[in-house]
A protein has these predicted regions:
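Secretory-pathway/luminal and periplasmic proteins that interact with or process carbohydrate-rich
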Residues: 82-89, 134, 153-159
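Extracytoplasmic
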Residues: 209-266
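N-terminal Sec-pathway targeting helices
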Residues: 2-17
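Substrate-binding/active-site groove segments that recognize
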Residues: 91-111, 126-132, 147, 153, ...
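A short, structured beta-strand-centered segment in the mid-to-C-terminal lobe
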Residues: 112-123
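Short, functionally critical alpha-helical segments immediately adjacent to catalytic or ligand/cofactor-binding
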Residues: 69-86, 100, 124-128, 145-152, ...
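Catalytic and substrate-binding regions of cell-wall glycan-acting enzymes that process beta-1,4-linked
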Residues: 39, 140, 144-188
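Export/targeting segments at the very N-terminus of extracytoplasmic proteins
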Residues: 26-84, 185
Length: 266
């Protein structure tokens, strides 16, 4: 019996090692895919104009010019962080449009009054300055800079190895919002000068974990591929899946398609 027990222990150790290796290989593959996506954006799309007229547009344009950053990148971060809400506050004590952490990151950026973070232009400038600093730290690698924006530079290695899964998720999450900002979503590019505030959002479900929100969207998109779906990390730490629509007609059409897919909007 002792020999059997020893053999099982050795087998468990071997299988555990194989599993860890496979997980590491998967993580590396995901990182490489994200690196490639962000590099493609850096090579071909950074000069493109936003597809919508977004809130605080003059603040974003000024910050992009000041720090030589793509305006669409700043907009993607802001949409993912707060959906452009100046008074947004997270349970991690991050504040404003770009969700600047108080007091640590804010003071690092020279902001010493919490109330200043609720001024959109001040907050957007701070977020842009921090992102530029991180891009310089990571030699222009957008994936790593965004991972550090979310997790802090102390937890993201410059060689990109052993990045926390949550930081990788965040980079992918912002890339999804970038596609929306560029007009690459299901609905295609909107009419020029369309106000972002004119696009409606109807909440479908809220999840406690990001992978559940992503899986729910993936299932719905297979059943109702023409419906515009998106998801946001809210200040509560929850993840909200929404249907987006431009006008009543699109709402009714999309709601009907979701009903046919087995999901009813009240």
């Amino acid at each position: 019996m002792a020999n059997v027990h020893d053999r099982l222990q050795k087998l468990a150790i071997i299988l555990g090692g194989v599993l860890l290796t496979l997980l590491a290989m998967t993580a590396d593959a995901v990182r490489q895919d994200l690196d490639a996506q962000w590099q493609s954006y850096a090579d071909t799309q950074v000069t493109l104009e936003p597809a919508f007229t977004f809130p605080h547009a003059t603040c974003f344009k000024a910050a992009a010019l000041q720090y030589q950053l793509p305006e669409t990148l700043l907009l993607a971060v802001a949409r993912g962080e707060s959906d452009f809400e100046p008074t947004a506050r997270s349970r991690a004590n991050a504040h404003g449009v770009m969700q600047i952490l108080w007091p640590g990151t804010a003071r690092h950026l020279g902001i010493h009054r919490l109330s200043d973070l609720y001024d959109p232009c001040t907050n957007i400038d701070a977020g842009a300055r921090y992102l530029k600093e991180l891009l310089n730290t990571y030699s222009g690698n957008m994936h790593l800079a965004l991972a550090a924006y979310n997790y802090g530079p102390g937890r993201i290695s410059k060689d990109g190895h052993n990045i926390p899964s949550g930081a990788t998720w965040y980079s992918d999450y912002i890339f999804r919002h970038l596609n929306y900002v560029l007009g690459n979503g299901k609905g295609g590019k909107p009419i020029p000068d369309t106000l972002y505030s004119a696009i409606g959002q109807s909440t479908l479900l809220t999840f406690g974990e990001p992978y559940r929100a992503a899986a729910f969207i993936a299932r719905l998109e297979k059943k109702a591929p023409s419906v515009s779906l998106d998801w946001f990390r809210r200040g509560t730490g929850e993840f909200e899946v929404v249907m987006t629509y431009a006008g009543r007609q699109e709402f009714d059409t999309s709601a009907g398609q979701l009903r046919n897919a087995g999901f009813r909007i009240d």
